[in-house]
């Protein structure tokens, strides 16, 4: 995966966030030429993302391209995310549901996706078809928006997109190719689906009265985070 990213985005700096994996992920990623940020134990998807964002902030990067490492996200699509950022978009969201045949998923996943797509679209004012997509490009403004003490530790999906919009950032979807997962397990499975639905719905319903997290500036959060 790392070499495919390097081939399709020459000159890009690759960071792998190893969320406490018990295997040789970190060593293999380094051998492939990536920088590795390793958690001492599994801290959750949201925390892994936040660690990567903080590292990008500390490094002074103006853009971040975010993708999963389970084979779903096609590195050939990275240039499309970059092109959308070039147009002035703050969050370029790769959607598997625009103009392509989406990979197979469970009925519960499809129903949940449509429901939260409807809610996110209503909040943002533009159609969002894939609110759970982790295939994204972020501008510097978007990076500063997610580096905060209130970033979700578990499932940062539709709620984060809505927060971006409320902060005046431009969110746009673009069609991307996604594949069947070749490794690992979906976060949206079993009892986790019920928890995800409950947590996400509650978060979105409370959005009108939720106060911004005031604690520390983005620079301070980035400097003091893993």
Positions of PLM-derived features:
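Acceptor/aglycone-binding surface of glycosyltransferases and processive sugar-polymer synthases
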Residues: 35-58, 65, 74-154, 181-202, ...
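Hydrophobic targeting segments
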Residues: 5, 13-17
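Catalytic donor-sugar/metal-binding loop of nucleotide-sugar-dependent glycosyltransferases
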Residues: 126-127, 148-152, 161-179
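Hydrophobic residues within well-ordered alpha-helices
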Residues: 29, 85, 163-165
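A conserved acidic beta->alpha catalytic loop
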Residues: 18-26, 71
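Hydrophobic/aromatic residues located in beta-strands of well-ordered beta-sheets
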Residues: 13-14, 64, 91, 160, ...
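Short, well-formed alpha-helical segments that are part of the catalytic scaffolds
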Residues: 1-7
């Amino acid at each position: 995966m790392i070499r495919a990213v390097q081939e399709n985005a020459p000159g890009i700096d690759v960071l792998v966030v190893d969320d406490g994996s018990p295997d040789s992920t970190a060593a293999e990623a380094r051998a492939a030429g990536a920088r590795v940020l390793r958690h001492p134990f599994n801290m959750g998807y949201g925390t892994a993302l936040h660690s990567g964002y903080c590292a990008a902030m500390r490094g002074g990067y103006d853009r971040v391209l975010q993708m999963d490492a389970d084979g779903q996200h096609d590195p050939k699509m990275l240039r499309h995310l970059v092109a959308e950022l070039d147009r002035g978009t703050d969050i370029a969201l790769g959607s598997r549901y625009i103009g392509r045949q989406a990979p197979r998923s469970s009925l519960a996943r499809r129903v949940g996706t449509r429901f939260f797509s409807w809610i996110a679209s209503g909040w943002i004012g533009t159609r969002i078809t894939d609110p759970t997509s982790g295939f994204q490009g972020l501008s510097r403004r978007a990076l500063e928006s997610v580096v905060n003490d209130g970033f979700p530790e578990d499932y940062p999906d539709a709620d984060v997109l809505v927060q971006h919009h409320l902060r005046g950032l431009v969110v746009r979807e673009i069609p991307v190719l996604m594949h069947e997962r070749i490794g690992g397990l979906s976060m949206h499975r079993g009892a986790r689906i019920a928890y995800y639905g409950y947590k996400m719905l509650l978060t979105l319903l409370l959005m009108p009265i939720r106060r911004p997290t005031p604690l520390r500036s983005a620079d301070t959060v980035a400097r003091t985070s893993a």
